Regions:
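N-terminal pre-Walker A segment at the start of P-loop NTPase domains
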Residues: 267-277
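Short, surface-exposed secondary-structure boundary micro-motifs
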Residues: 67, 119-120, 233, 566, ...
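Inter-lobe coupling/hinge segments of SF2-like helicase ATPases
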Residues: 275-278, 286-607
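Upstream accessory/linker segments immediately N-terminal to the RecA-like ATPase cores of bacterial MutS
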Residues: 74-264
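Accessory helical-bundle/CTD segments and flexible terminal tails appended to RecA-like ATPase motors
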Residues: 513, 532-542, 549-556, 561-564, ...
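OB-fold nucleic-acid-binding modules
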Residues: 38-70
Length: 698
């Protein structure tokens, strides 16, 4: 039977080829199915009619019934506008349009009764409504007298009269074509067991809800299904992998681990570190491949946990590899691990793109013989020329900078897949971790080593620069180092914000006795590394930089970081930057400098940073403020797999619930052969063919 929802959107009444092209390009809508799954972002209650004598300019919305007494065109050029004088018998207001004047004069008539809806404002002492929604009063429908849906649109769509009201009309036309109920996408037993509305009812009520309760049920049904299929896909992938790859069994904790623990451990492990090592040991001895995500703030001791995990692999006769996203971070890990293992008979090597010639050949040869026990490196370890004698443990630092394909490439360097521990200093809220890293078990180091002084965070306005520089000078005199971070490299014509080039000149002039490093993303890697090394070694006292320093610089002597135009940064990025200070024994200060012009959301962000150092608290707040986003901060909202209705920040409880439901199904039907579940696997296949980036979540 033909599924009408697959019909091309251009054949829908009110669309046509021209509008179809706009919908294709602007909203990625190609079929009736795409249109029906383009959900409203809000609803406005239009059940009440007001009288003109009741209204004022502060009301959020008004709805009136009356007539247009007359039209007049005012102004010239861009100021040209159409004004309709509208009355309901109790008073007169102005309806104002700045676009489509010819069209409006052809379609709207004087002395004809209309329902008018919009936001009132006051101009020249008179109440007016700009670009109101208007319907003939004889067409009293659910949308004009109930909950009205509002759809996100673009400027290009509005120019073609495809505003929210226009999309609403297209939705009505699409639903009118559905002579049969929409085919179910969940098995009947799931719909019954979880008291879900049918798909057909849900789609109709999400666009045109008859009442708030039916809207709530429609939203619940569609959120349930969306999150359920995300979790089903992740869990099926994860269970398949566990069945196919049995994994190495590391039951022995031997001489290397015990010697390190008794003689080389630099300080007492925190309770959180002990708990995580116990979880890792349990995984390694289970006979299945470990795939674990280790979360912990900067300075929480993740590297030490990673090293102790690698030593377990060594005790069981296997090699270990640690991969970092940058050469500086890889070199830092190499130096840290060598210091930890000082005096022990463990060979550690560093392999990066910059390691060439005979030294590289020697490392590659000794990896194949097993003489190199621990390899630290960058993407260079993924090259086909790099092989191992017996790779048993892989540590990946800063997971979101490596793709799933790269992770899998490391597995392929062994006959039996090695255990994998993924480390990140980017705190990820539990609900988001469950969705983005559903195939990984999660461990959290949620306490810092004793003796660390909490970083003092201060927000100040940029008119207090003299006192700021005096504080910096005092810190430098006491032998400390300073970071100053800018949002831009060069001056922008469009934005009046501080930039690194001007900032560098200013700082050099302000602190003539100091050596100043300059680091930004457009420098050549060798030049950038050299400047960073000057700061790390203490040769320079001040580093002027962009956010390139958020990962990979460990300078315990740096006690102050100043963030210029802090209002330009997101919470996650700010938290990563703060992790660059507070690494030594001295009190550290983190200073957020802003202008007075701050939005309400920006004020909230800055307040959160001043009030807490807890990365997980900040991550939860970030998720609520701006959506899941891209973990590197380049995409400001939304997630890789483009959730249409569910909200990970607000639907965490439902996410956990559907995960349990999906888990039960995968456990009961691991091979996917039960007839009653056929619809699930068919739907998964269909979803994989859409624009959902399933690879990103599995």
């Amino acid at each position: 039977m033909f599924d009408i929802t697959t019909r091309d959107i251009k054949y829908l009444q009110g669309v046509g080829p021209q509008r179809a092209t706009v919908l294709n390009k602007e909203l990625n809508l190609f079929s009736l199915h795409d249109l029906l799954y383009y959900f409203p972002y809000k609803y406005v209650d239009r059940s009440r009619l007001y009288y003109i004598h009741e209204i004022d300019g502060n009301m959020p919305y008004i709805q009136l019934k009356g007539e247009i007494l007359s039209f007049e065109t005012l102004g010239e050029g861009r100021q040209r506008r159409l004004v309709g004088h509208f009355s309901d018998g109790t008073g007169i207001i102005d309806l104002v349009w700045f676009q489509g004047i010819k069209y409006l004069l052809e379609h709207y008539k004087t002395r004809t009764e209309y329902i008018v809806f919009g936001k009132p404002t006051v101009f020249n002492g008179r109440i007016n409504v700009a670009h109101p929604d208007m319907d003939p009063s004889g067409e009293l429908t659910l949308s004009t007298m109930g909950l009205q849906p509002y759809y996100n649109t673009t400027e290009r769509m509005k120019r073609g009269f495809l505003n929210s009201h226009g999309l609403e009309k297209l939705m009505k036309n699409a639903l009118a074509l559905l002579q049969e109920p929409l085919a179910e996408t969940l098995p009947p037993r799931l719909v019954e067991e979880h008291h879900l509305m049918s798909l057909d009812e849900a789609i109709r009520n999400i666009h045109f809800p008859k009442n708030p309760e039916l809207l709530r049920k429609a939203q619940y049904r569609l959120k349930f299904e969306e999150l359920f299929y995300v979790q089903l896909n992740i869990l099926r992938y994860s269970k398949d992998r566990q069945r196919k790859y049995r994994g190495l069994r590391f039951e022995r904790v031997g001489e290397i681990f015990n010697t390190f623990y008794s003689q080389n451990l630099p300080f007492e492990l925190t309770g959180a570190q002990k708990r995580v090592i116990k979880e890792i040991r349990k995984d390694m001895g289970s006979g299945r491949q470990m795939n674990r995500l280790l979360q912990g703030d900067v300075g929480s001791g993740k590297t030490l946990v990673a090293l102790m995990s690698m030593l377990i692999a060594l005790d069981n006769g296997y090699q270990a590899c640690m991969m970092a996203p940058t050469e500086i971070l890889a070199a830092q890990h190499y130096e840290t691990i060598r210091k930890f293992l000082f005096g022990m008979d463990v060979r550690v090597e560093l392999l990066m793109g910059s390691v060439k010639g005979k030294k590289r050949e020697k490392i590659l040869k000794d990896l194949l013989t097993g003489d190199v026990q621990i390899l630290i490196g960058t993407h260079a370890v993924l090259e086909d020329t790099v092989g191992f004698s017996s790779l048993g443990m892989v540590i990946i630092d800063e997971q979101h900078r490596f793709g799933v394909a790269q992770r899998a490439k490391l597995w392929s360097k062994n006959v039996c897949p090695p255990h994998v521990l993924v480390m990140t200093a980017t705190p990820i809220p539990r609900t988001l971790a469950m969705t983005l890293y559903g195939d990984l078990d999660v461990s959290v180091i949620d306490e810092l080593p004793p003796g660390r002084k909490p970083i003092q965070t201060i927000h100040q306005f940029d008119n207090r620069r003299a006192s700021l520089y005096a504080s910096i000078r005092k810190q430098i005199e006491e032998g400390r180092q300073i970071y100053i971070v800018y949002p831009l490299i060069k001056e922008s014509e469009k934005m009046d914000i501080k930039n690194l080039e001007e900032g560098y000149e200013l700082i050099c002039a302000e602190f003539p006795d100091c050596q100043v490093s300059k680091v930004h993303g457009k420098m050549k890697p060798a030049e950038k590394d050299a400047e960073m090394q000057r700061f790390v070694s203490g040769e320079t006292q001040i580093m002027v930089a962009t956010t390139v320093i958020e990962v990979g610089v460990n300078v315990p002597n740096a006690s102050v970081m100043v963030i210029e135009n802090a209002e330009r940064f997101g919470l996650s990025q700010l938290h990563q930057l703060r992790g660059r200070v507070g690494r030594g024994a001295d009190q550290s200060y983190w200073i957020l400098v802003t202008t007075y012009k701050l939005t309400e959301e920006t004020r909230k962000r800055l307040e959160i940073m001043v009030q807490t150092n807890d990365g997980f608290e900040i991550a939860e707040a970030d998720l609520k403020l701006r959506g899941p986003g891209d973990l590197e901060g380049t995409q400001q909202s939304g997630v890789a797999f483009d959730l249409k209705i569910a909200d990970i920040a607000r639907d965490g409880q439902l996410l956990q619930y559907v995960r349990d439901v999906a888990n039960r199904i995968v456990d009961e039907d691991p091979a996917g052969t039960r007839p009653e579940n056929a619809i699930l696997w068919q739907q998964l296949q269909a979803l994989r063919k859409t624009n959902i980036n399933w690879a990103a979540i599995s």
